[in-house]
A protein has these predicted regions:
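Long, low-complexity, intrinsically disordered segments
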Residues: 249-257
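Glycine-biased, low-complexity coil/linker segments
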Residues: 196-223, 229-236, 241-244, 250-251
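Nucleotidyltransferase catalytic core that binds NTPs
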Residues: 1-213, 234, 256
Length: 257
């Protein structure tokens, strides 16, 4: 029996915890049989990264680019399963890999007639697995904590918060902790997607400079700039609180069965 393993997820961002799951799956089912499935759906707060960004992150950690697939629905991933011929499907076991947190997405209840549903947990003995024409299977990957800025981390939302709240040195350290090196390309991606490189203050000062032509106006500009800076910081705090609230809602939203 051959294996086709699909590791679905949002991956905003793809991090060392995800890579640990990928490595575990390759040891269980073979490196050539494991595919990461993710979509290009974006949301500025909870899903900020493009699919191409995720490919950069995953390949930086060692996943072959050909094994990171853009799909419409990661938890079906028909773009991957359709790569097999009917003959291959009849001799291939299909496995979806999820963390314990996401396992509730899957329902192992029997059909109305009492027969087993299509999706089943991976059996203790892999020799008992049926081909994907009869059943699909769900493997629950171990949860792995990793260190970011000297503290344990295990979620993408936690990483996004740390990055947004940090300064330039903090953000470079986070990139190094996540990907092994202070990769400038990945840092630029994070800065852009997480909205931490907006030159708001520079734009405001530039506009003021255009209209300030003499000393009295320059003195007034300095006072206005101080108040504007206070307003900017206030709005940043409000935006940060909103982002944290949206991350909390996303993580605790009931999943469809």
């Amino acid at each position: 029996m051959n294996y086709l393993v699909i590791y679905p997820g949002r991956f905003h961002p793809f991090h060392q915890g995800h890579m640990a799951s990928y490595d575990w799956l390759t040891k269980q089912f073979g490196e050539n049989n494991v595919y990461i499935a993710s979509s290009n759906v974006q949301d500025p707060e909870t899903s900020p990264f493009e699919f191409g960004d995720k490919v950069k992150m995953a390949t930086k950690l060692g996943v072959p680019a050909s094994h990171v697939v853009n799909v419409k629905n990661p938890y079906q991933a028909t773009e991957i399963t359709s790569m097999l011929s009917d003959e291959e499907k009849a001799n291939t076991a299909l496995i979806f890999a999820v963390s314990a947190k996401d396992a509730e997405r899957f329902n192992f209840a029997p059909k109305k007639d009492g027969s087993p549903g299509y999706l089943q947990p991976v059996p203790d003995n892999k020799k008992d697995m049926k081909p994907m024409t009869k059943h699909g299977y769900v493997a629950i990957t171990p949860t792995v904590n990793f260190r970011v800025k000297g503290a344990d981390a295990n979620s993408a939302s936690q990483i996004r918060k740390l990055y947004r709240d940090g300064n330039g040195n903090d953000r470079l350290a986070i990139i190094t902790d996540l990907y092994g090196t202070p990769d400038p390309e990945l840092k630029a991606v994070f800065d852009q997607r997480l909205g931490v490189n907006e030159p708001a203050e520079g734009i405001i000062y530039g506009q003021e400079a255009v209209f300030a032509g003499d000393n009295p106006v320059s003195v007034m500009r300095e006072d206005r700039a101080h108040k504007l800076q206070e307003n900017i910081e206030f709005m940043r705090k409000k935006l940060r609180a909103l982002r944290e609230k949206q991350d909390y809602i996303e993580e605790h939203r009931p999943r469809k069965k």
